[in-house]
């Protein structure tokens, strides 16, 4: 299988940089997969789990929004936050969700809508984590 270069960058670190076979990305308009030779494309990311396949192994990384650019040079993702599942503290993640739920009653209007959307994304990630743990 042909490979391409992939960079995943967050404000804190370069989370990944290297040659890969495929990257599955949680796009705002729907999830999409990237292979070598993909057409140029720019997309916004939603919070979700990014799957990187390289050399027959998969690495899963949580991203909390950002921007993806596919060009002839490869795929670059600028993520608001990028955390490998290996680094994730699932107890702290669950506590974050509980805190978000508790603060919903303090929000109104558009702020409430955004808070609910973010909470839904976090709950979806948590559900995916629980499903991943079973496999």
Swiss-Prot record:
Subcellular location: Cell inner membrane
Gene3D superfamilies the record matches: F0F1 ATP synthase delta/epsilon subunit, N-terminal
GO cellular component: plasma membrane; proton-transporting ATP synthase complex
Gene Ontology molecular-function annotations: ATP binding; proton-transporting ATP synthase activity, rotational mechanism
Membrane topology: Peripheral membrane protein
Cell inner membrane among keywords: yes
Main subcellular location of this protein, as a coarse class: membrane
Entry keyword Manganese: no
Any Pfam family the entry gives: ATP-synt_DE_N
Keywords for the protein's UniProt record, in alphabetical order: ATP synthesis, Cell inner membrane, Cell membrane, CF(1), Hydrogen ion transport, Ion transport, Membrane, Transport
Family: Belongs to the ATPase epsilon chain family.
HAMAP family in the cross-refs: ATP_synth_epsil_bac
Complex and partners: F-type ATPases have 2 components, CF(1) - the catalytic core - and CF(0) - the membrane proton channel. CF(1) has five subunits: alpha(3), beta(3), gamma(1), delta(1), epsilon(1). CF(0) has three main subunits: a, b and c.
Functional description taken from the UniProt entry: Produces ATP from ADP in the presence of a proton gradient across the membrane.
Identification of the protein by name: ATP synthase epsilon chain
Species, as recorded: Bradyrhizobium sp. (strain BTAi1 / ATCC BAA-1182)
GN (gene name): atpC
């Amino acid at each position: 299988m042909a490979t391409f270069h992939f960079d995943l960058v967050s404000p804190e670190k370069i989370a990944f940089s290297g040659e890969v076979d495929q990257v599955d990305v949680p796009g705002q308009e729907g999830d999409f997969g990237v292979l070598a030779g993909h057409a140029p494309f720019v997309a916004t990311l939603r919070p979700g789990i990014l799957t990187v396949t390289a050399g027959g192994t998969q690495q899963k990384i949580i991203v909390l929004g950002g921007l993806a650019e596919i060009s002839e040079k490869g795929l670059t993702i600028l993520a608001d936050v990028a955390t490998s599942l290996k680094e994730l503290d699932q107890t702290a993640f669950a506590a974050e969700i509980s805190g978000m739920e508790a603060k919903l009653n303090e929000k109104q209007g558009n702020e409430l809508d955004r808070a609910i959307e973010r909470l839904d994304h976090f709950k979806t990630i948590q559900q995916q984590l629980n499903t991943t743990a079973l496999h």
